[in-house]
Amino acid sequence: EGWGGATYDSCIRFLNEDPWERLRKLHAALPNNKIMMLLRGQNLLGYRHYADDVVDKFVETAAKNGIDVFRIFDACNDPRNLERATKAAKKTGKHVQMAISYAVTPFHTNQVYADLAKTYAEFGADSICIKDMSGLLKPYEAYDLVLAIKKACDLPIEIHSHATTGLSVATELKAVE
């Protein structure tokens, strides 16, 4: 993830930088690398929902300025918040990776995540990301989760795990099995 998420806001709020210029510089400096952005679905990079035409234009502009992969997610895993951004990203011809926000609750079972991955595949996702932003995914749970998702859809799967608990490397190694 080279752009998007909080980097856009941080450029403006804290660094007095133009986030679009930053993206263009990244693209120029990394001509042989794909630049991925983290996109909060209908929230784009902000903290509220935006109108569909704003979503469309933002995604189109991001693609034109150097984004190659759109990693699209909703923190609550609500597909309704992802549908428009996904359509807009697919229209650019860029890679669309839809992310599952991993959480540990009685509701969040492997079947729930597998069903979500199937929905994302139906939306036209090119790949799935298990986004473990709190670092709570354990190795054997990752193994079982990847198996469940692989049964639900035939898309490449990535794991993005933070090292908060120190388990990220072991988790990713077990998930690869």
Which stretches of residues belong to each language-model region?
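Aromatic/hydrophobic pocket-lining residues that form the small-molecule binding cavity
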Residues: P19, L23, V55, L82, ...
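Catalytic cores of alpha/beta
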Residues: Q111-A117, T165-E177
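Conserved anion-binding
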Residues: R84-A117, F123
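Alpha-helix-loop-beta-strand connector modules within alpha/beta enzyme cores
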Residues: I12-L38, A85-S101, A142-I159
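Hydrophobic alpha-helical hairpins/lids featuring a short glycine-rich hinge
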Residues: H49-T92
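Catalytic domains of carbohydrate-active enzymes, especially glycoside hydrolases
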Residues: E1-A6, E60-V69, F123-G124
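Glycine-rich, proline-tolerant flexible connector loops at the mouths of alpha/beta enzymes
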Residues: E1-L23, G41-Y47, F70-N81, V104, ...
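Glycine-rich beta-to-alpha transition loops that act as phosphate-gripper elements at the mouths
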Residues: M37-L45, S101-F107, P156-V169
